[in-house]
């Protein structure tokens, strides 16, 4: 074994140290997520493409939820995806419904929460400096400015660096434990410690996607794919 590889137990220990410093309730016996060797890292191009697709869907979902989605909006989104990034065929089934304007109002509202999963992808790409304590929504203006900044996939690729998988796994372990805290608080009325469950859940979803390459639910064209329907048990 490579002695430089951090074990799942070590990640758990680091997370618990953080939770203790933040006065966030936790349980010692919550299982691990992954050992490093269990995970196939996603490449930078794949993460960028997912970020671009998610961004376009979120923008359309925001318009739908306000009752303002137009044919011009749809054409603009499709051109953004096909002409600027060539990723139109990489949309998930739910994203396809959003951009087609056929998703329900409730579905569109849920789709807007993907902002937090997208925030995680931009963190993984080094654009977002850190994943701060999940009690406030992400900087939506920064996301929009970022997506407006790049001229296309090559430009995006040239100006970003994917974080090491060890760093991503550490963030996943911490948010997994945050998620347990929020679920326990919702069910049993225990201390929430200032956490926002929706933010925690969506950020964890983004981190889970970064770590589930090659798994059964990794095919984005499937209706139960890991982006639209992440497995978030605690």
Give residue ranges: language-model regions.
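Extended, charge-rich alpha-helical interface modules
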Residues: 2-234
